Amino acid sequence: MASPSAYDLFRNGTRLLEDGDFHAATVPLLRARELEPGKASVREALGRALFGAQRYQEAADEFGAVVQSAPTNDYALFCLGRSLQMLGRHDEARHPLALASTLRPEREDYRRYRDRARRRADAA
């Protein structure tokens, strides 16, 4: 029997992710990343699953990798910032959240978390 392809693993992982089964979604998505480490869509989905599973440092690492390859990916910037916030690293979260809100000024949620990171970093 052939091993599943990166695409099949990605589809399985995203299906689990959409169903809210974050922990289970990490399993096929980690395998997909092993097969396709440069694929931003795989890394972004894995970051979402890790964030949902409250594995914030790993999520930040995945979103950081996406931002490295696609520095104007507003969603990856936003998720990187949110991951850093969940780790209590509000000062570090300010930059990616500010970039995300600049890239997508219509996103009220981006602005809200950007402002929250600024306030918490300034209070520290």
Where are these regions (language model features)?
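Alpha-helical segment of the N-proximal tetratricopeptide repeat
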Residues: 3-35, 52
